[in-house]
A protein has these predicted regions:
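General beta-strand structural signal in soluble alpha/beta enzymes
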Residues: 70, 89-91, 118-121, 139
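Conserved small/polar residues in nucleotide/adenosyl-binding loops
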Residues: 158-164
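Short acidic-hydrophobic, aromatic-tinged amphipathic segments that line or gate anion-handling sites
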Residues: 47-51, 120-123, 154
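Glycine-/Pro-rich loop/turn segments that contact NAD(P) or position catalytic residues
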Residues: 97-136
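ATP-grasp fold ATP-binding core
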Residues: 109, 133-154
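Short glycine-enriched loop/turn motifs at secondary-structure junctions
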Residues: 41-42, 90-91, 113-115, 143-148
Length: 165
């Protein structure tokens, strides 16, 4: 029996490490990346460059693999769902959708009695002022942040007469 061909969406550091580890157990890998020079290109059995929302690219990827995983969460849910209709995607697309939004993810964890660090949702300057006692802290975007991107160390709160933003 042949080992399955693993499709990996994303060709960055994690995709590269996964493809390299797969080689050691004779698993073929196909990396799909929107970066033509992604590092994973050098580790995968096959490399497909294209946009994640391009039907031809996605179909070529689906036809080249047996199952799919991804190295980062910022892949549109609709794309993962479409791929999952033809090839199994793990973690499930619904899990990815949950973790794409930090606020939704934290609420889910807390509702399921899983401890998280203390957090508050800040939508404007007024929300920040109400929680000034929590400073210093990190101000994070709720979506599209990764590896420190979308995160800002916040130590002091300056007040002004400016309108609430």
């Amino acid at each position: 029996m042949n080992a399955p061909t693993l499709g990996i969406i994303g060709g960055g550091q994690l995709g590269s490490l996964l493809a390299d580890a797969a080689k050691k157990i004779d698993v073929q890998t196909v990396i799909l990346s929107d970066d033509p020079d992604a590092p994973g290109k050098h580790f995968a059995t096959k490399f497909i460059f294209g946009q994640y929302d391009d039907d031809t690219t996605i179909n070529n990827f689906i036809n080249a693999v047996d199952l799919v995983t991804y190295e980062f969460e910022n892949i549109p849910f609709t794309i993962l769902k479409k791929i999952n209709e033809k090839k199994k995607v793990l973690p499930k697309p619904e899990i990815n959708k949950l973790i794409q939004d930090r606020e939704t993810e934290k609420k889910f964890l807390n509702e399921n009695n899983i401890a998280t660090t203390k957090y508050v949702t800040v939508k404007n300057k007024k929300d920040l002022s109400k929680n000034a006692d929590l400073l210093p802290g990190l101000l994070k975007t709720t979506t599209l942040g990764y590896d420190g991107k979308g995160q800002y160390k916040f130590c002091l709160l300056y007040t002004s007469d400016a309108a609430d933003e």
